[in-house]
Structure formats: structure tokens, C-alpha cells
Regions:
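Acetyl-CoA-dependent GNAT
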Residues: 10-14, 20-21, 25-95, 99-101, ...
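Active-site acidic-Proline motif in GNAT/NAT acetyltransferases
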Residues: 99-105, 133-134
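Acyl-donor-binding surface of acyltransferase catalytic domains
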Residues: 1-11
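C-terminal "cap" of GNAT-fold acetyltransferases
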Residues: 5, 125, 132-139, 143-145, ...
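Conserved hydrophobic beta-strand within the GNAT/NAT acetyltransferase core sheet
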Residues: 93-96, 127-131
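Conserved GNAT acetyl-CoA-binding A-motif
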Residues: 112, 119-130
Length: 175
């Protein structure tokens, strides 16, 4: 059941610092789930983050959506359209994160649905994502949103002396 006062919305430039905090939290909480690591993101100048946010407001080829309750960001997801001419019909969902105390309440599904709506609004034919096979809750969320598996990259991530396989999933929009 979705929490009261939940807002799913596009990121605002004023959210940059809170979003960076949330991203760093995600990388500490679940380092195996992401391609980039905490030290890399924490080591970037703050201007790199504000630039990312400025280009992710949803009006171009990239968007970041957040889950907010009473002014606090508790979840996030990014989506972007491929910049290449031959693949501009496709987009990628990335960086899905919901704070642990809010998991199991449908927030990730709402965030992914926001990406789906954005992709459809941009006229995309497909959205893709990657998820580690060791995360059945995330896989279930994506399947519930209509994504289907099309392959697995063995040993895609190496985190804390362990390999993780990455399941590739796609959602095809019907014309």
C-alpha cells in the first residue's frame, strides 16, 4: 500500500544536494546493485552533480524522478533516451533506489511507472534496464511493470570480492 502524502515527481534543480545524498546512500546500502561506486560519486566535484540534475529535468533526453514524502526524498530513478540516431527509439532505466524503511510499499513500482510514462511520452519503442540476479524483489517489480528478461551478463559486477550476474530486461511499447 502506498504511503499517504507520497509524491512522485521530476527532479528540480533545487533538489541536487538531497538527490546526491540519496544516491550516496544507495551506493552504500546496496553497492552490488550499481555500476558506479560510492568513492567514484563522492569524489566528483559537486558541479558534476548539479550538471547532471540540470540535464535531467525531463524536458530533454533524460529525466530523474523522485519519491517524496513531506519534503524528504526517499526514492529515485533515472531514465534516458539513447543519443545515437540508430537507437533513439530506445531508453534506459537506471539507478532505482528506495530507502530501506520504505521498501515493500510499492514506491519502486511507482517510480518505474513514471519512467514508462516518460518514455511513452517521448515516443520510445522500448525501455531497457539491468538488475542483479541476486535481487528477486527488484526483478518482481520490473516484471510487474511489464519488463521481460532477454539475457544475463555473467559476472557483470565485482563488489566486495564477489561477482554478480546482471539480468537484462526490456519493455516493448505497442504502437
Amino acid at each position: 500500500m502506498l504511503p499517504d502524502h507520497l509524491i512522485i515527481r521530476l527532479i528540480l534543480q533545487d533538489d541536487a544536494r538531497a538527490l546526491l545524498s540519496l544516491r550516496l546512500e544507495a551506493l552504500q546500502d546496496s553497492p552490488e546493485a550499481y555500476g558506479e561506486d560510492y568513492d567514484f560519486v563522492a569524489g566528483q566535484p559537486y558541479s558534476a552533480w548539479t550538471d547532471l540534475v540540470a540535464h535531467s529535468l525531463g524536458d530533454g533526453d533524460r529525466a530523474i524522478f523522485v519519491a517524496e514524502i513531506q519534503g524528504q526524498l526517499i526514492g529515485m530513478v533515472g531514465v534516458n533516451r539513447s543519443p545515437m540516431k540508430n537507437t533513439r527509439h530506445a531508453g534506459s532505466v537506471w539507478g532505482v533506489y528506495v530507502q530501506p524503511s520504505w521498501r515493500g510499499k510499492g514506491l519502486a513500482t511507482e517510480l518505474v511507472q513514471a519512467c514508462i510514462g516518460w518514455g511513452q511520452g517521448k515516443g520510445l519503442a522500448t525501455l531497457r534496464l539491468g538488475v542483479i540476479t541476486a535481487n528477486p524483489a527488484a526483478i518482481h517489480c520490473y516484471e510487474k511493470c511489464g519488463f521481460r528478461t532477454f539475457g544475463v551478463d555473467p559476472n557483470a559486477f565485482f563488489v566486495n570480492n564477489r561477482y554478480y550476474d546482471l539480468m537484462r530486461m526490456t519493455l516493448l511499447f505497442t504502437p
